[in-house]
């Protein structure tokens, strides 16, 4: 079983602004969000299939607790409440489908994958995919 536990810092990010656009975030808020999310700090605790993930930026801190295969509540990248279900896509990759609790919007998901001692995080909104690569601190 892969070990996601540890603290992670972002090395690169692609398409974050495009992702926010696809989610309908206005230009002013996108500018603030892109600046704030340029140096996120991620802490992951893992006990088998049980995960705790805390992501901190200068503007916002999010925390999620979940177990693979059990639905849980969290927020989409743009802050809307959703019901999520994380599953193992393969032995090193978690896929999490998000379903909005209220309202309409693009189909969203995230993945987290360990590869070559890097954490590869993707956020998807319909056809737009943001990829962020993290390294251990």
UniProtKB/Swiss-Prot annotation:
Any one Gene Ontology BP term: fatty acid transport
Matches recorded under CDD domains: CRABP1
Binding site for all-trans-retinoate: 132-134
Source taxon at top rank: Eukaryota
Matching InterPro entries: Calycin, Fatty_acid-bd, ILBP, Lipocln_cytosolic_FA-bd_dom
Keywords noted in UniProt: Cytoplasm, Retinol-binding, Transport, Vitamin A
A Pfam family of this chain: Lipocalin
Localisation: Cytoplasm
One example GO MF annotation: retinal binding
GO cellular component, one term: neuron projection
Family membership noted in the UniProt record: Belongs to the calycin superfamily. Fatty-acid binding protein (FABP) family.
UniProt function note: Cytosolic CRABPs may regulate the access of retinoic acid to the nuclear retinoic acid receptors.
Comment field on protein domains: Forms a beta-barrel structure that accommodates hydrophobic ligands in its interior.
Descriptive protein name: Cellular retinoic acid-binding protein 1
Species of origin: Gallus gallus (Chicken)
